Amino acid sequence: MRSHFCTEISEKDVGKTIKVAGWCNTYRDHGGVVFIDLRDKSGLVQLVCDPSSKAYEKALEVRSEFVLVAKGRVRLRGAGLENPKLKTGKIEIVLEELVIENKSATPPIEIGNKSVNEDLRLKYRYLDLRSLNAYEIFKLRSEVALITRNTLAQKGFLEIETPILSKTTPEGARDYLVPSRVHEGEFFALPQSPQLFKQLLMVGGMDRYFQIARCFRDEDLRADRQPEFTQIDAEMSFCDENDVMGVVEDLLQEIFKAIGHTISKPFKRMPYKEAMENYGSDKPDLRFELPLIEVGDCFIDSSNAIFSNIAKDPKNQRIKALNVKGADALFSRSVLKELEEFVRQFGAKGLAYLQIKEDGIKGPLVKFLSEKGLKNILEKTGAKIGDIVFFGAGDKKIVLDYMGRLRLKVAETLDLIDKDALNFLWVVNFPMFEKTENGYHAAHHPFTMPKNIECEDIEEVEAHAYDVVLNGVELGGGSIRIHKEEMQKKVFEKINIHEEEAQKKFGFLLEALKFGAPPHGGFAIGFDRLIMLMTKSNSIRDVIAFPKTQKASCLLTNAPSPINEEQLRELHIRLRK
């Protein structure tokens, strides 16, 4: 039907007769001469037709998004008529034959216009996908999947599918449940990850497994979350953390070659505690400086009882400083007010600061600090004339969070972030357990191997867990797993999953661990998030062919939707009103 894609045609084809096919991107009638920009997956080429052509009458019928097959002769555009914005901007095709394969209703959205309301774009997603940008995104997505398969296969990994219909083990996010017609009153769950099955594959001697896995989580949505998503999932036997990290680094190095980036290995490693204390985040963006500085000891003798009491409780509370170079000339009073309102959203009671001016140090904190305290702050933060030092004080968790967010906000405001940089980081030595209202739960998941399980302070127990971070975004992570039944039971006990409940939920895993499970570990990388970062897309929805909205619905198909009474009866379900 066609001899060339649109952008395959160039000056070397001048004089040749070729056939192209695609959609009418734009249509123009200039004094009887018809110009059509034809679009296919590769890009655009201009078709031209005057009244002397036998295709002229057909060309007059063409409108936006009509499906066309065109035959014609390639010629150079006239002097001064070239379009440098197009790859084919120096040539055009003089129409000899034109077939309208299909007509189109007037499109409700302009193809490729990102300013169109997103809900409308998602409702007509099949039109939205016609944009050249969308094609490039999914072309890259396909390439990355192929690179992943080839790279891991070369390292001895087997691609193995794990079940989609699985057992509900509600830990963390809610499961999507599927009622069983055969087993009345019982349900399957869609997998939140292949975690337990890939561990069982290691017990089964598969040694190295991977899949590009579909996962499902019924959780509140954010800009970078979807109820169904894809991850690069892998597991290895007889390995330690360094082995797993090495595989991930090799894989990411190969993947980023696809967009022309050379990334160096090994990636920097940072303990979780250092990341939180210095950057207020377990996924710090290191494309810019601005570390948080601990200055609690500078407030020990403060005349403000609130600050001095916080300084005397370093286990549970923090006083953190953020020195912003040159900010005194850049931040007006209104900007300072905006920053205060910003941190209040995250639990701050206010935002104290010191302005380092030529005629002295100004700010509401000055009167509460001794001369020694002020001197120590300047030394610790490296503050000079023209700088502003911001302070956060109070509960450790709250302060680290809002000061970390302030760090990012300031960097964005002052344009300190190199948008073209790629800064990879491993965050390691995560806490094994986190405190909740009802005791403790596993910070990653309860199948992670702890480092020091006998530690008297449960909050000091660390995990053999690791996250890979790119530019402040968690790409993925993993851990070394528990491979002995006794240790698995011990971890369950720590998070109040006692024997009976453990057997009910995870009895099949505990049974498997009795039969010589090898040491093993693995990782998962968020595939959608990876593609979002590689393409610099604004939303994860841009890199998924048919995404859900932030209300977990599909505007294209109107899913989820009600089902009829007969279907409900077959599934032994009665709805309560």
From Swiss-Prot:
Q: Which SUPFAM superfamilies match?
A: Class II aaRS and biotin synthetases, GAD domain-like, Nucleic acid-binding proteins
Q: Which reaction does it catalyse?
A: tRNA(Asx) + L-aspartate + ATP = L-aspartyl-tRNA(Asx) + AMP + diphosphate
Sorted UniProt keywords: Aminoacyl-tRNA synthetase, ATP-binding, Cytoplasm, Ligase, Nucleotide-binding, Protein biosynthesis
Q: Where does it localize?
A: Cytoplasm
Primary localization: cytoplasm
EC nos: 6.1.1.23
Q: Where does this protein hold L-aspartate?
A: E171, R217, H444, R481
The segments labelled Aspartate in the record are: 195-198
Q: One GO CC annotation, please?
A: cytoplasm
Residues involved in ATP binding: R217, D218, E219, Q226, E474, G526, F527, D528, R529
Q: Which GO terms describe its molecular function?
A: aspartate-tRNA ligase activity; aspartate-tRNA(Asn) ligase activity; ATP binding; nucleic acid binding
Source domain of life is Bacteria
- Marked site, Important for tRNA non-discrimination, at H30, G80
Q: Name one GO biological process term.
A: aspartyl-tRNA aminoacylation
The record's annotation in InterPro entries points to: Aa-tRNA-synt_II, aa-tRNA-synth_II, aa-tRNA-synth_II/BPL/LPL, Asp-tRNA-ligase_1, Asp-tRNA-ligase_1_N, Asp/Asn-tRNA-synth_IIb, AspRS_core, GAD-like_sf
Q: Which cysteines are joined by disulfide bonds?
A: none
Q: Which family does it belong to?
A: Belongs to the class-II aminoacyl-tRNA synthetase family. Type 1 subfamily.
Purpose of the protein: Aspartyl-tRNA synthetase with relaxed tRNA specificity since it is able to aspartylate not only its cognate tRNA(Asp) but also tRNA(Asn). Reaction proceeds in two steps: L-aspartate is first activated by ATP to form Asp-AMP and then transferred to the acceptor end of tRNA(Asp/Asn).
Query: Matching HAMAP family, A to Z?
Result: Asp_tRNA_synth_type1
Self-association state and partner proteins as the record states: Homodimer.
Q: Which PANTHER family match?
A: ASPARTATE--TRNA LIGASE, MITOCHONDRIAL, ASPARTYL/LYSYL-TRNA SYNTHETASE
How is this protein named in the record? Aspartate--tRNA(Asp/Asn) ligase
State the taxonomy lineage.
Answer: Bacteria, Pseudomonadati, Campylobacterota, Epsilonproteobacteria, Campylobacterales
